[in-house]
C-alpha cells in the first residue's frame, strides 16, 4: 500500500463532512463543486461473496442484492453504493444470450430482431429484464433505508460503447457492418435512456456512462451520438442526479450537462472551471490521489469479482484518510 497521509499520523481526528447526497446537491448546481471530492468506486458483483451466492443469482435477487450492497458499503465506507454496473446489462435486457461462466459475462448471441426495435419495444424489454428489475428494486430499498445518505450510483454502458457491442454481436451476419451505425446508435441510446429512467425513478443519484467507444468529432455519426447522449444527461439533471461520462478527452465534445471523467493517468490540460471526475485504475489497489482538482473520484470500471475485500477496504480507508486531511486543512 502506498504511503498515504492519514488523519492519525497528522494528529487529526475524523472530520465531519456533509452527507454524500448533500455534496451531490452542491455539484448539481452549475459550476459549483463540493469542498471535498466524492469517492465513488464501482463495486457491485463483489458483494455476492458476502451473501455466499453465485454472481448471476445474486444480481437477480433484490433482497440479497440490497443486503449485500449495504454490508459491502459498511465495510468500505466510501461515499456511494453501486446499484448497477454495465457487465452486458443492457444487451441482456434487449434479449442477448450471455455466457455466465465468466464475469463480466460475455455476449454469445445478439438480441432477437435488434435492428427492428422501436422505442416502445425497447422500453418493454428493459422493464421486464430480470437483472434490471432486481437492481431497481434494490435501489429503491437502499434509497429508503441506507444510513448516512450514501450516493446511489448506476454505471451504464454508454451509447457509443453499447452500439459497438451490438455491432460485434451481429457482425457474423454478412449483411451487417462490423462498425457502429447511426441506427445502432439510436437503438443503443434509447436503451440506455430507458434503463437510466428506471434507476432514476427508484432514487439513483449518480449516472455514470462508461463510454470508451465515443466517436471522434470528425466521424459522421458523431452528431447522432450527441443527439442520443443529451436526453440521458438531461433526464438525470431533471431527477436532480449527477450525469458523469467516463471517456477519453480526445473525441466528440460532451453535452454541457455531463461531468467529464477521465482516467487519472491521462488528465487533459483543459484549464476549465467545469467540475471534473477522475477515475482510479481497478487493475491495482495502490491508489494515489491525483494532483488535479476533481469533484468526484471513481474507478475506471467495476472492481473485479475476485478482489480481496480486506485489501480493498484498506485502499478505501487510505483514500478516505486523505480526504479527511483535505477537509481538516482546507486543501
Q: Which residues does each PLM region occupy?
A:
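Active-site-proximal, glycine-rich beta->alpha crossover segments in alpha/beta enzymes
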Residues: 3-9, 99-198
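N-terminal amphipathic alpha-helix/helix-capping segment at the start of soluble metabolic enzymes
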Residues: 4-46, 136-148, 183
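Catalytic-face loop-and-helix region of soluble metabolic enzyme cores
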Residues: 6-11, 23, 50, 237-331
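Generic structural signal for well-ordered alpha-helices
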Residues: 21-24, 66-70, 136-143, 196, ...
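Short, well-ordered coil/turn segments that N-cap beta-strands
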Residues: 33-37, 77-80, 147-152, 203-205, ...
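Catalytic domains of carbohydrate-active enzymes, especially glycoside hydrolases
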Residues: 67-86, 194-206
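Glycine-rich, proline-tolerant flexible connector loops at the mouths of alpha/beta enzymes
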Residues: 80-102, 119-128, 204-223, 301
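Aromatic-anchored, glycine/proline-accented short structural segments
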Residues: 192-247
Amino acid at each position: 500500500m502506498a504511503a498515504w497521509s492519514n488523519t492519525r499520523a497528522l494528529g487529526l481526528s475524523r472530520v465531519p463532512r456533509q452527507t454524500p447526497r448533500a455534496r451531490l446537491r452542491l455539484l448539481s448546481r452549475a459550476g459549483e463543486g463540493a469542498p471535498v471530492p466524492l469517492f465513488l468506486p464501482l463495486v457491485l458483483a463483489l458483494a455476492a461473496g458476502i451473501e455466499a451466492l453465485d454472481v448471476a443469482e445474486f444480481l437477480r435477487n433484490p433482497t440479497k442484492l440490497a443486503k449485500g450492497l449495504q454490508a459491502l458499503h459498511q465495510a468500505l465506507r466510501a461515499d456511494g453504493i453501486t446499484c448497477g454496473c454495465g457487465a452486458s446489462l443492457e444487451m441482456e435486457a434487449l434479449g442477448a444470450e450471455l455466457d455466465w461462466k465468466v464475469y463480466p459475462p460475455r455476449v454469445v448471441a445478439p438480441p432477437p430482431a435488434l435492428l427492428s426495435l422501436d422505442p416502445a419495444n425497447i422500453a418493454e424489454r428493459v422493464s421486464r429484464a430480470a437483472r434490471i428489475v432486481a437492481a431497481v428494486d434494490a435501489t429503491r430499498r437502499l434509497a429508503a433505508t441506507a444510513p448516512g445518505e450514501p450516493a446511489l450510483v448506476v454505471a451504464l454502458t454508454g451509447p457509443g460503447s453499447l452500439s459497438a457491442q451490438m455491432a460485434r454481436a451481429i457482425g457474423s451476419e454478412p449483411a451487417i457492418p462490423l462498425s457502429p451505425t447511426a441506427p445502432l446508435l439510436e437503438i443503443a441510446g434509447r436503451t440506455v435512456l430507458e434503463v437510466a429512467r428506471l434507476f432514476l425513478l427508484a432514487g439513483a443519484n449518480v449516472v455514470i456512462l462508461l463510454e470508451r467507444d465515443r466517436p471522434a468529432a470528425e466521424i459522421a455519426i458523431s452528431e447522432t451520438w450527441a443527439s442520443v447522449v443529451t436526453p440521458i444527461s438531461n433526464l438525470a439533471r431533471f431527477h436532480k442526479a449527477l450525469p458523469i461520462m467516463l471517456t477519453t478527452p480526445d473525441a466528440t465534445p460532451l453535452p454541457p450537462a455531463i461531468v467529464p471523467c477521465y482516467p487519472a493517468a491521462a488528465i487533459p490540460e483543459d484549464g476549465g472551471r467545469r467540475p471534473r471526475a477522475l477515475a482510479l485504475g481497478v487493475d491495482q489497489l495502490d491508489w494515489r490521489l491525483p494532483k488535479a482538482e476533481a469533484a468526484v473520484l471513481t474507478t475506471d470500471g467495476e472492481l473485479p469479482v475476485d478482489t480481496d475485500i480486506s485489501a480493498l477496504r484498506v485502499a478505501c480507508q487510505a483514500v478516505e484518510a486523505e480526504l479527511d486531511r483535505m477537509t481538516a486543512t482546507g486543501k
